Swiss-Prot record:
It holds the Pfam family FAD_binding_3. Gene3D superfamilies: FAD/NAD(P)-binding domain. PANTHER family: FAD-BINDING DOMAIN-CONTAINING PROTEIN-RELATED, HYDROXYLASE, PUTATIVE (AFU_ORTHOLOGUE AFUA_3G01460)-RELATED. It comes from Gibberella moniliformis (strain M3125 / FGSC 7600) (Maize ear and stalk rot fungus). FAD-dependent monooxygenase; part of the Fusarium detoxification of benzoxazolinone cluster 2 (FDB2) involved in the degradation of benzoxazolinones produced by the host plant. Maize, wheat, and rye produce the 2 benzoxazinone phytoanticipins 2,4-dihy-droxy-7-methoxy-1,4-benzoxazin-3-one (DIMBOA) and 2,4-dihydroxy-1,4-benzoxazin-3-one (DIBOA) that, due to their inherent instability once released, spontaneously degrade to the more stable corresponding benzoxazolinones, 6-methoxy-2-benzoxazolinone (MBOA) and 2-benzoxazolinone (BOA), respectively. It comes from the Eukaryota. Its EC number is 1.-.-.-. Keywords: FAD, Flavoprotein, Monooxygenase, Oxidoreductase. This is FAD-dependent monooxygenase FVEG_12630.
Length: 420
């Protein structure tokens, strides 16, 4: 979207035979929406037409409310009714991924997209990059941006000197997830469906919120797996029996309403993986964006917005590179300066978000180093400005800073910076 809006020539290579979305619920915090406004102003009204927030005018600025997994769900606790976190300038909105994807891809000319292209090899040369696909075809480009997800092929090329950082790292937990009609969810949870919730517990947790205009209910039922570890190498999901799934929540201390939700989920373990360490988001002419760069745990609902920030900064850098008269090998120093600037601006922020999301995961399972199982310590950590740096950051400043750093690097190498 960003490249097209800026008039930069591009081709999008997609592994699948058509656009498809993995997962259900997705949303953008204020930083994500402001970034998308800078990428494509026409997106916002289309997005707002399909998204939904919490139910009730007085709950629109609540990000999540904290509850418990245990019997009673925490409604008898002194903190109940005061366990939400958010911000007066934050408005919670979520949508169904498939509907959102349909909107986003409507801004991408279909003639720029090639489907059924599974990337098998990347060859970097002084004058460009050659891509090889499984179907035997090759393609040439000046810059490759890998947005190929958590199991990225492009990541292996960028991090060839850091082989231990290529594969995603298991975070010691997995979840079962489902989307059900709101009527079914209401029968189980009643008005607890009105506002997005995170349920905390010893080794078990849950995340719930409304999507699809309020017609559907999206949820994750989470399991700590830090002792056993993930068994399937190269896979992030595992299909098991219904009985095995139910046994994960058989502890009688768990509220039965969560078990009722679990009966409606498919018996598939979705492993929580992330890229906890990444030495660089680029190498020479190849860059990483989105999950290929900084796949995160979902507990801050911030991964998608970080991908948008990547896209805005990188497309702005490439727009500057495109102004250069040099081509082929002569363009390489400008590309490297641009991608280095992109990395230096985006990586610290994206990695901080990733680390904070992992910390929230530890809170959910009562494993936080300082808060433990004490909700009177957990909730203040979430309520007292934790997300301000993330939500109210001006990504246009990042664009300016990245271009400034690119100019500085180029000026060291010669007078070409005068053309930027």
């Amino acid at each position: 979207m960003a490249l097209h809006k800026k008039g930069i020539s591009f081709t999008l290579y997609e592994d699948a035979k058509e656009y498809s979305a993995v997962g259900a619920g997705i949303g953008f915090a204020p930083n994500g929406m402001r970034t998308m406004d800078l990428i494509e102003p026409a997106f916002r009204p289309l997005y707002e037409a399909i998204c939904v927030g919490n139910k009730g005018e007085d709950a629109q600025d609540i990000f999540f409310e904290g509850m418990l997994v245990e019997e009673g769900l925490g409604r008898d606790k002194p903190w109940y009714g005061h366990s939400g976190w958010g911000h007066p300038d934050y408005v919670r909105k979520s949508a169904h991924r498939k509907t959102l994807l349909d909107i986003m891809t409507s801004f991408i000319p279909i003639e720029n997209v090639k489907f059924n292209k599974r990337l098998t090899n990347i060859e970097q040369r002084p004058d460009g990059v050659t891509l090889s696909s499984q179907d035997g075809t090759t393609a040439e480009c000046s810059v490759l941006a890998g947005a190929d997800g958590i199991k990225s092929t492009v990541r292996a090329n960028v991090l060839e000197h850091y082989p231990n950082q290529i594969a995603p790292v298991y975070a010691g937990a997995y979840c079962y997830r489902a989307v059900i009609p709101m009527a079914e969810a209401y029968e189980i949870l009643g008005d607890l469906t009105d506002v997005a919730k995170i349920y905390f517990g010893h080794g078990r947790g849950a995340v719930t919120y409304r999507i699809s205009g309020g017609d559907e209910f999206n949820y994750l039922l989470c399991v700590d797996d830090s002792l056993d570890g993930w068994k399937l190498e190269g896979a992030v999901t595992e299909t098991i029996s219904h009985e095995a799934m139910m046994s994960d929540f058989e502890d009688p201390r768990i509220d039965d309403r969560l078990r009722q939700l679990l009966t409606k989920a498919k018996p598939v373990k979705w492993g929580f993986f992330h890229h906890i360490r990444t030495a660089s988001y680029y190498r020479d002419r190849v860059a990483l964006i989105g999950d290929s760069a900084h796949a995160s745990l979902p507990f801050q609902a911030a991964g998608a917005a970080q991908g948008l920030e990547d896209a805005l900064v990188l497309s702005s850098i490439l727009s500057e590179v495109a102004k250069m008269p040099e081509r082929g090998a002569d363009l390489a120093p400008f590309i490297k300066a641009g991608l280095s600037a992109y990395d230096s601006v985006r990586r610290p922020r994206a990695q901080k978000q990733l680390e904070q999301a992992a910390e929230v995961g530890r809170m959910i399972f009562f494993q936080h180093e300082e808060a433990g199982a004490d909700m009177d310590k957990i909730l203040p950590r979430l309520q007292q400005g934790r997300f301000n740096w993330l939500w109210f950051h001006d990504t246009n400043d990042d664009v300016k800073e990245a271009i400034k750093r690119m100019q500085k690097q180029i000026s060291v190498g010669g007078p070409s910076v005068a053309r930027i």
